[in-house]
From Swiss-Prot:
It is found in: Endoplasmic reticulum membrane. It is a multi-pass membrane protein. It comes from the Eukaryota. Its main location: endoplasmic reticulum. The keyword Endoplasmic reticulum applies. It comes from Betula pendula. One of its GO terms (biological process) is protein N-linked glycosylation. This is Dolichyl-diphosphooligosaccharide--protein glycosyltransferase subunit DAD1. Component of the oligosaccharyltransferase (OST) complex.
């Protein structure tokens, strides 16, 4: 039974790899940006666990900045994806402008939180 589970897992990984190979390059760049933002948030959490969280506002601001940016990038990816039927009428330039404006608002709130 473990052998069939291993084969199923390998088949699943192979099918995911082949499906992702067909993804347009602009979506792959957004995916890379999301991975970078989440990785940066993880580094901040590990640093806080090792060193401590003396300026807790700074830690929360950095973490919320990374997570908020990743969420906004995922929203951008959903809107820019041509296969998504819900956002067919939305131009990619409009989606990017929304992303930039929301990022600006997010970071203004975070800077205000820092004090």
């Amino acid at each position: 039974m473990a052998r069939s589970t291993s084969k199923d897992a390998q088949a699943l990984i192979q099918s995911l790899r082949s499906a992702y190979a067909a993804t347009p390059s602009n979506l792959k760049i957004i995916d890379l940006y999301v991975v970078f933002a989440v990785f940066t948030a993880l580094i901040q959490v590990v640093y806080m666990a090792i060193v401590g969280s003396f300026p807790f506002n700074a830690f929360l601001s950095g973490l919320l900045s990374c997570i908020g940016t990743a969420v906004l990038a995922v929203c951008l990816r959903i809107q820019v994806n041509k296969e998504n039927k819900e956002f067919k009428d939305l131009a990619p330039e409009r989606a990017f402008a929304d992303f930039v404006l929301c990022n600006l608002v997010l970071h203004l709130v975070i800077m205000n939180f820092l004090g």
